[in-house]
Amino acid sequence: MASKKAGGSTRNGRDSEAKRLGVKAYGNELIPAGSIIVRQRGTKFHAGDNVGMGKDHTLFAKIDGYVEFKTKGALNRKTVSIRPYTGSEE
């Protein structure tokens, strides 16, 4: 009669859920106020003109407008700004 002793349990087998980080709105994209532009850990991108930063470093639009990515300053920081939407564009 074939038999097998019970195997031990493993301590592995779990993983954390993906956090869906990254750029959500790209350059020259028209977005409404309050839209999330970048979800990030830390300040990979810094807030520029008309952009706010949440407590988890999420960047969001303060006004309706077009997204602009630029590098600024001696440290070449990546900044995200919103160019205002006037209504006469497009």
UniProtKB/Swiss-Prot annotation:
NCBIfam families: L27. Residues 1-21 are annotated as: Disordered. SUPFAM superfamilies: Ribosomal L27 protein-like (SSF110324). It comes from Neisseria gonorrhoeae (strain ATCC 700825 / FA 1090). GO terms for biological process: translation. The keyword Translocase does not apply. One of its GO terms (molecular function) is structural constituent of ribosome. Belongs to the bacterial ribosomal protein bL27 family. It holds the Pfam family Ribosomal_L27. Coiled coil: none annotated. This is Large ribosomal subunit protein bL27. GO terms for cellular component: cytosolic large ribosomal subunit. Transmembrane segments: none annotated. The keyword Ion transport does not apply. InterPro entries: Ribosomal_bL27, Ribosomal_bL27_CS. The gene is rpmA. Keywords: Ribonucleoprotein, Ribosomal protein.
